Amino acid sequence: MIQLFRRIGAFNNLNTLYKEKVNLLKKLRETDLPILHTLIYSSEKPRWTLYNAPYFDEYKQLNLETFLQSENRLFFLSENVLAIVHEERIIGVVTRYWEDIRTRWLEIGIVIYDDSLWSHGIGTSALQEWIGICFKAFPEIERVGLTTWSGNPGMMRLSEKLGMTQEARIRKVRYYKGTYYDSIKYGILRDEFFALK
């Protein structure tokens, strides 16, 4: 997560660029961080870590004080992250970062920390909203991408439900617990996305 924060770069202010009604997503505030901390670090090995790039082995359980003093705090409060809200409570986040800002290559991600809410259509709605926000915030970009791995079939299905195209499958480059998995890249172009709406 910290590596992701370092790659982000500057983004324009979300609130001034996106004026449409937001249904599922909201900007995180300082007062939301203890709630988010509980969601993320509720156990030594939460279920979401099994699917969110576990081959990087980056998850470390942090106490609240350490979390609030870490770079993760800045990451979650940045314009590159919005909270996913369901029934008035935070359940996850959507993120974005520049793979290469010079070539206008933007990538997005999503984590729903509460696994009891997986496969309820919430992720689909949240990412659809987020893609729209990204295209509106950056009128110069023509594509939004998402990278996952073959060990996360739920994310693959979600990407396809959103109308994203599988643009690349880099075979056997994610070695995890004795098994090789593929890295899978999805993308959707601006005109494709707005044609679906």
Name the predicted role of every residue range.
Residues 29, 57-60, 77:
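Generic structural signal for well-ordered secondary structure
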Residues 1-39, 81, 85-197:
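Acyl-donor (CoA/ACP) binding surface of acyl/acetyltransferases
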Residues 45-69:
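Conserved GNAT-fold acetyl-CoA-binding loop/helix
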